């Protein structure tokens, strides 16, 4: 199998929310989804597809504390800005690792 989409979660979110091609064309506007739904798709739903939803995919007690820290909230920025949100750092197994 070959991946059919980018492995970049913010790009995946942006594509799902905006439905704009790299050439700027709108494709399937009726298939747009909300930023909230897109965020679930790249977090808990992705974990579910790997059968790891009990370990990762959401920030709750008992799960691994592995997640990306963003400089802006993808749920509150304009849909067109989602893909350009910068990564501040990560948290891996509870350890905060800012990008230098």
Question: Which residue ranges define each predicted feature?
Answer:
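His/Asp/Glu-enriched, well-ordered alpha-helical/loop segment
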Residues: 1-76, 80, 85-93
